[in-house]
Design a protein with these regions (language model features):
Chain A
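Hydrophobic alpha-helical context, especially transmembrane and signal-peptide helices
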Residues: 47, 52, 81, 110, ...
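Generic detection of short hydrophobic beta-strand segments and adjacent strand-loop junctions
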Residues: 14-20, 81, 127-129
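Mid-chain, well-packed structural core segment of small domains
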Residues: 67-95
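HotDog/MaoC-like acyl-thioester-processing domains
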Residues: 1-13, 86-136
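Hot-dog-fold acyl-thioester-processing enzymes
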Residues: 1-75, 136
């Protein structure tokens, strides 16, 4: 993928993720080391008034998978998100993205969104990548 | 706590973490990311890496397995764990980071904002982490905004 082939407004292919399960939250807790009990322990979810919710960073991980599906991991230089809504087990997340801006030095800036099947946005992010040029 | 602004400048003990291939694989499996560069050396080399790279959000693993636990961090910040949410997360990648690298992380609170809304106030606490590899190179910077609801 070359810098010249990317245009502002281009959309990337949607990444559809499998439905989030409680087992996945347990796996993510162990893999990431985020043992906040709000993600795995029913009683704590009730105490917080939210019920069990998915790790925000799991959803960011899915968004990162989207970004590195669209442009190679090697080329990604910045990635930031704002968490908008909580995600519960049973929800299915899809990741969409588009090109917002092309800057000097072969930099592209893109938007990435994670939303559930009803279109509720869970996180909104921005990524920056440096792509090779055909002129290099 | 008396004044949440007092948190600005608070430094955490530096921590160290050796990145293992198996941990990277466990992490991408939990996310369901099947990109072969994270477990197949040939695929990683084909993309221009010299080893198995870390996924974009793997820096969190380094923080939580190498540094403070969630509970310890809440105690250090004097925050009620059931009142907090993750507001924002920023990552900047300066150099490639590979399985086998040993990263040392320095971490401190760089900003506190207090917001008042109709449904009550909240504190926004920004922590910045700097990641150096075993050669002393700064390889990544992250910033985390924690929301503490009053």
């Amino acid at each position: 993928m070359y810098y010249e082939e990317i245009n502002v407004g281009d959309s990337f292919p949607t990444l559809q993720k499998d439905e989030i399960t409680r087992v996945q939250l347990v796996k993510y807790a162990g893999a990431s080391g985020d043992f906040n009990p709000l993600h795995t322990v029913e009683e704590v979810g009730e105490q917080a008034g939210t019920g069990i919710i998915a790790h925000g960073m799991l959803i960011m991980g899915m968004a990162a998978q989207g970004v590195t599906t669209w442009i190679p991991r090697k080329n990604v230089k910045k990635f930031q998100v704002r968490f908008k809504k909580m995600t519960k087990p049973g929800e299915s997340i899809e990741i969409t993205g588009k090109v917002l801006e092309k800057k000097e030095n072969n930099i592209i800036v893109g938007e990435v969104l994670a939303m559930n099947s009803e279109g509720e946005v869970k996180l909104a992010g921005i990524f920056e990548g440096v792509l090779p040029s055909k002129n290099d | 706590m008396s004044n949440v602004n007092d948190l600005v400048g608070l430094e955490f003990e530096p921590y160290c973490f050796e990145i293992e291939k198996g941990k990277i694989r466990e992490f991408v499996q939990a996310i369901g990311d099947d990109n072969p560069i994270y477990f197949d050396m040939e695929a990683a080399k084909k993309e221009g890496f010299q080893g198995i790279p870390i996924p974009l959000t793997f820096l969190q693993v380094i923080d939580l397995w190498g540094g403070y636990s969630f509970q310890e961090k809440m105690e250090k910040l004097k925050l009620n764990p059931v009142k907090i949410l993750h507001g924002e997360q920023h990552f900047e990648y300066l150099e490639d980071i590979y399985a086998g690298d040993v990263l040392t992380v320095s971490s401190k609170v760089i900003n506190v904002d207090i917001k008042k809304g109709s449904s009550g106030g909240m504190d926004l606490i920004t922590t910045e982490n700097q990641y150096k590899n075993q050669h002393g190179d700064l390889v990544a910077i992250s910033r985390n905004v924690t929301v503490h609801r009053h």
